[in-house]
């Protein structure tokens, strides 16, 4: 795979028409050398038709045939993939999950994205919504409270909210992952306590995947995944879940998965969307 050109433009936040225009302006200088367009987008994406039943962070794409509209505008083949699933595809084809039969990707950010690999294939689901971890409930007794969803328990957003509360800071106090891990790496007790709680929340969901899908590996992505302390703590807490039930005869033979960092970072969506395009049009 050879990268010829790179660049970025701001994503329009107002209308789909402006979004399509921005994409067309990117396409136009290369139209004579482009066979097709592979693109990762947020939301629930029908990869076969390019129809979005939910636009995610770009709500103007909800209930629209975005793939068809872009194909008509540019006059070429278009393949749309959900951004989390594209990242999982990149890891499966050329990253941390190469050779895996069953595996998963957790992308920890504003919410929790990613994808699931089963029998060596990306799982999209009947309605193309498989792997939408943000909506997974973590507390059946608290079903009516959305704060019990993984988006509010296993995301960077949650980590920073808990840290502000632990420090007695206002909810809108400036805070980011870099500042948090500076404190945690310096051994600050409050930061380490919050990190332990956070890793327990994530580890329980990895445990659930282990039981449900018998995954070999779970690859962790997102900005904070670059922090060695996160992976170190997460692995220790995950192993501790098994150790805490070590005397149960019913746990005997239950395998543990390997927790690894994603190989790709910001380019994962592009790489994964390209592989999805090649599968759709060249396999």
Task: For each feature predicted by the language model, list its residue ranges.
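A cytosolic small-molecule/anion-sensing beta-strand core signal
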Residues: 41, 48, 118-119
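Conserved phosphate-binding catalytic cores of ATP/NTP-utilizing and phosphoryl-transfer enzymes
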Residues: 67, 78-103
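Glycine-rich phosphate-binding loop of actin/hexokinase-like ATP-binding domains
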Residues: 98-153
